Design a protein with these regions (language model features):
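Glycine/Thr-rich phosphate-binding loops that ligate phosphate moieties of nucleotide
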Residues: 1-172
Length: 172
């Protein structure tokens, strides 16, 4: 957890949520001589997931309720280690689907509700969505990741000015 002090900010081409900043760029913080390729790899997965936690936090604040379950689809849903990492960082159960066509299924469900074949999305989901597995948060890991997330949230402010200075110099 936290890759022994190594943190990655995943702003490779700027960021939109929660920062509207096209000039921010990704960075590794805390690189040391003992870090290996596996640490950088895990740090990238953690950084991406911590960035998604920013979105989860905003959605929960706006909705004024906790998200009870998140659905993971696509290639990342096949990585059991990443699913567990997500459950621990989000402190929310992560479920995968029996079908790998999550986006297509969602579009078809929206169309079916739009055509009034179902009263609402919940009724449609009850008919079409089949879950494969559920990964539960691990309390000790959740607590450890809260500390990592606190450090992660400071990275944007700590690197923003340097990234903006860099962009102002290369644009000339």
């Amino acid at each position: 957890i936290g890759c022994d002090g190594l943190l990655f900010s995943p702003y490779i081409v700027g960021e939109r949520t929660p920062y509207t900043d096209s000039q921010i760029r990704g960075s590794f913080i805390g690189i040391d001589t003992h870090h290996q390729l596996k640490d950088f790899t895990r740090s990238v997965l953690e950084g991406i997931t911590l960035s998604l936690k920013d979105s989860q936090r905003i959605m929960e604040e706006v909705a004024e309720e906790k998200i009870e379950r998140l659905v993971s689809v696509g290639g990342g849903a096949k990585n059991k280690s990443w699913l567990q990492m997500q459950a621990n960082i989000f402190n929310t159960p992560i479920v995968t689907l029996k079908t790998e066509q999550g986006p297509g299924l969602g579009a078809a469900m929206l169309a079916a509700v739009g055509c009034q074949w179902f009263l609402d999305l919940q009724e449609c989901a009850d008919q079409f969505v089949a879950y494969k597995e559920e990964v539960q948060p691990q309390p000790q890991q959740v607590d450890a990741y809260k500390k990592v997330y606190d450090r992660y949230q400071k990275m944007y402010d700590a690197t923003k000015d340097l990234c903006h200075l860099y962009f102002s110099q290369i644009e000339k």
